[in-house]
Amino acid sequence: MQQSTPYLSFRGIGKTFPGVKALTDISFDCYAGQVHALMGENGAGKSTLLKILSGNYAPTTGSVVINGQEMSFSDTTAALNAGVAIIYQELHLVPEMTVAENIYLGQLPHKGGIVNRSLLNYEAGLQLKHLGMDIDPDTPLKYLSIGQWQMVEIAKALARNAKIIAFDEPTSSLSAREIDNLFRVIRELRKEGRVILYVSHRMEEIFALSDAITVFKDGRYVKTFTDMQQVDHDALVQAMVGRDIGDIYGWQPRSYGEERLRLDAVKAPGVRTPISLAVRSGEIVGLFGLVGAGRSELMKGLFGGTQITAGQVYIDQQPIDIRKPSHAIAAGMMLCPEDRKAEGIIPVHSVRDNINISARRKHVLGGCVINNGWEENNADQHIRSLNIKTPGAEQLIMNLSGGNQQKAILGRWLSEEMKVILLDEPTRSIDVGAKHEIYNVIYALAAQGVAVLFASSDLPEVLGVADRIVVMREGEIAGELLHEQADERQALSLAMPKVSQAVA
């Protein structure tokens, strides 16, 4: 039952940056012993609010009230001292230090200028035990997994007696087992009476953990859902984007041209049996399968990231020899990879450079001088047409949201003569509004005659976007479904591993 007095309240919070109004009149309450989710599209204001709560930013208007007391934090240390801790997606730890040193960084127990390592390790051990973690406090942090790093970050918050702990996209780099462990810890923290704020784009996580959900849109408060029995996926999407869920995918029947891409008994590392399929001009074919099905491995082989070990790839009925990505690009086949940060973008380069990097070679002056005029025009054109939200073309792409990074990668390939596009998990870790924009780009490419082959583990997405669904299971094609006939039961039935007849 909800308490009558909130432990944390936001009262009329506004935040303005030069030329940008990031937050306007944000007001809502959070209660002790609850997980309160914050949802909204990228740019909705969630991260800005957390930075105000943590002392990174001062609000332009309004106030933060904690346990009935109006607070004003000059910096993050002041917020920590008031019991506020933020667990960011990019963890703020020191790899070369020990686990214990990271937990008590800034408050190491010492006497006469010498750190009391025995006491340090003992106290750190208590915090780790509290979280159910069997880790030697004297272990250098660099030897731990990302999931263990996160537990150290939480232990660091508990060591400062944090009563308010906010998690910002905490599962983005975790394995399934690490996610389960994180959820166990969050539920324990809730039982202890702490306020938990949880930011995620993943609906299944929100429904698994939350006692309340507050939705933001364009820097404004939309609604707080407090009865979790009465809220569903569709209601959340509508609150976030102002559209019904049926409008998100926007699929419509279309006509197709001649066969554009054909795989004839193709094998690649991670693909167990030869794969044969075809995609016509203007057709969108979705590859669906569970983890380990071989979708990404097939995509990498087709683009030359790994070597095709058998079979033949054809584009417009012509055999293509693909031994490296440049061969695929020259043939008109492009890839948006699954891990866009590691394999798609060049993080420390500008949006302009990331869009132009592939087609640049075709527009150099005199064979060696970069054509700045063409590059500026090309980047600006794709920023406008793809609605890439950036202060300008010279902004570092690492500072953009995942959805805008993905659109920049699409802009890169739109600068080429594209016949086939391979999309591997194109909307992973992207908010629902940006997903809608990505789908529209996919439809536009199909309308231009591009053959689209996209792999996704998001079954509703595959069913909602693809004209035809090819289901993979353990490195082989298990079946094929047409858009008008496909449903989740059929697709999952095909995707599930076969039970061995040898098992009793």
UniProtKB/Swiss-Prot annotation:
Listed name of the protein: Arabinose import ATP-binding protein AraG
One GO location term (cellular component): plasma membrane
Keyword Membrane: yes
Gene Ontology molecular-function annotations: ABC-type L-arabinose transporter activity; ATP binding; ATP hydrolysis activity
Entry's EC annotation: 7.5.2.12
Job description of the protein: Part of the ABC transporter complex AraFGH involved in arabinose import. Responsible for energy coupling to the transport system.
SUPFAM superfamilies on file: P-loop containing nucleoside triphosphate hydrolases (SSF52540)
Gene3D superfamilies documented for this protein: P-loop containing nucleotide triphosphate hydrolases
Family: Belongs to the ABC transporter superfamily. Arabinose importer (TC 3.A.1.2.2) family.
Chief site of localization: membrane
Keyword entries, A-Z: ATP-binding, Cell inner membrane, Cell membrane, Membrane, Nucleotide-binding, Repeat, Sugar transport, Translocase, Transport
A Pfam family: ABC_tran
Species for this entry: Shigella sonnei (strain Ss046)
Sequence ranges assigned to domain ABC transporter in this UniProt record: 8-243, 256-499
Membrane topology, as annotated: Peripheral membrane protein
Binding site for ATP: 40-47
Reaction catalysed by this enzyme: L-arabinose(out) + ATP + H2O = L-arabinose(in) + ADP + phosphate + H(+)
